[in-house]
């Protein structure tokens, strides 16, 4: 369960969030496999997460990285922070994220911190409630980031100017 594993490949920042060993009991004993949860981002608003399973740890991590690259979304950031405060949930995990002023840094824990770092968010206040299962926390964080829209995109959808919205 390392959160510090970070590589730069093709302009993407890759982080390993979790490695888990699981066992399947069969007639002859136990079969051990490994699952990996990774997040990938470009540091400019594009971010993705993936899960991989294999009998070997490196193969599971590689599969997770490939899945994360296929599962990328674009996040509308307001400079180095979020557009507005938001709540999101997945399963029993609930996350709350709010924009922070310049120089605050990423105040978030565990899996949520990894997602926000690779997405390019540099100033944010975040809290996780309920279950802290890394898989569900990453899902909840992604739901929140995916739902976030910039005022410009909302104005364009409504056919108004940004000043008319506020």
UniProtKB/Swiss-Prot annotation:
GO biological process, alphabetically ordered: translation
One Pfam match: Ribosomal_S5
GO terms, molecular function: rRNA binding; structural constituent of ribosome
InterPro entries assigned: Ribosomal_Su5_D2-typ_SF (IPR020568), Ribosomal_uS5 (IPR000851), Ribosomal_uS5_bac-type (IPR005712), Ribosomal_uS5_C (IPR005324), Ribosomal_uS5_N (IPR013810), Ribosomal_uS5_N_CS (IPR018192), Ribsml_uS5_D2-typ_fold_subgr (IPR014721)
Gene Ontology CC entries for this record: small ribosomal subunit
Domain S5 DRBM residues, every copy: 12-75
Domain of life: Bacteria
Listed PROSITE patterns: RIBOSOMAL_S5, S5_DSRBD
The entry's keywords: Ribonucleoprotein, Ribosomal protein, RNA-binding, rRNA-binding
Subunit structure: Part of the 30S ribosomal subunit. Contacts proteins S4 and S8.
Similarity field: Belongs to the universal ribosomal protein uS5 family.
Task performed by this protein: With S4 and S12 plays an important role in translational accuracy.
UniProt-listed HAMAP family: Ribosomal_uS5_B (MF_01307_B)
Official protein name in the record: Small ribosomal subunit protein uS5
Organism: Pseudomonas fluorescens (strain SBW25)
Gene name for this UniProt entry: rpsE
